[in-house]
Structures are given as structure tokens and as C-alpha cells.
């Protein structure tokens, strides 16, 4: 991955994310916000206590995704997604997202927001131990 793409990837921004449909096998693309916290890339959403979003189900079935950068640079970046369920791991990431969005309901987000962490094969920053 070239330096311009790496730099763009590590700026919190709106992206498109492609997952593979768990039942159909068809590619599914959504617009969502990508966060960077000290080199760790993660994606979250607003709390929905009534259901789990389809894209989370898709990632659980097949963690291979594509991040589509579309703001300062255009690039399609393959990645592996991991659904984060442990509250202790979720809390600092949800706190960062809440702060960025001007929200104060961190505990609600910890309990009910979708959260995935991304690993990008060609990016040393997302592959830290």
C-alpha cells in the first residue's frame, strides 16, 4: 500500500464497506464511518437495542471485507473484520466514537452499537500485536 493510501486510510471518515451476504453470497455495500484510534481501525454505528444489523451478521459469516475510500483519495482496500463483543474491549473504542460524534451515551453504545475492528494486510499500523 502506498503512503498516500495509508495516510488516507488512517483519517477518520465516511467510507463504503462491502461485505458478502451470509445467505445469498452477493456483495453488499453500505456507507458507514471509519474510525482511527492510535492506528487501530474500527467501525461502529448508533445503538440499536432491538436488532443486530445485517452487515454484522454478514461479517460473522465471512470476515473478508473491502473498505472503499472515497473522500481525499479513492481506493478499494481488502481487510479482515472482527466483531468485538467484549465490553472491556468495546468501551475505549465506543468512548472514542462517542466523543467524535458529540454523544454522551457511551454505556448505551457499549451495550447496543455494532463494532468491528479491521486488519489490513498491507498496513503495519493495523497489524500491531
PLM feature spans:
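Short low-complexity stretches enriched in small and charged residues
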Residues: 1, 31-38, 69-76
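Short helix-to-loop capping/linker segments positioned immediately adjacent to catalytic or ligand/cofactor-binding
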Residues: 4, 21-24, 103-107
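A generic structural micro-feature
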Residues: 9, 24-26, 59, 110
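Short, basic/aromatic recognition patches
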Residues: 1-14
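Short, structured beta-strand-loop surface elements
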Residues: 48-123
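Short beta-strand segments
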Residues: 12-48
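Conserved alpha/beta cores of soluble small-molecule-handling proteins
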Residues: 124-129
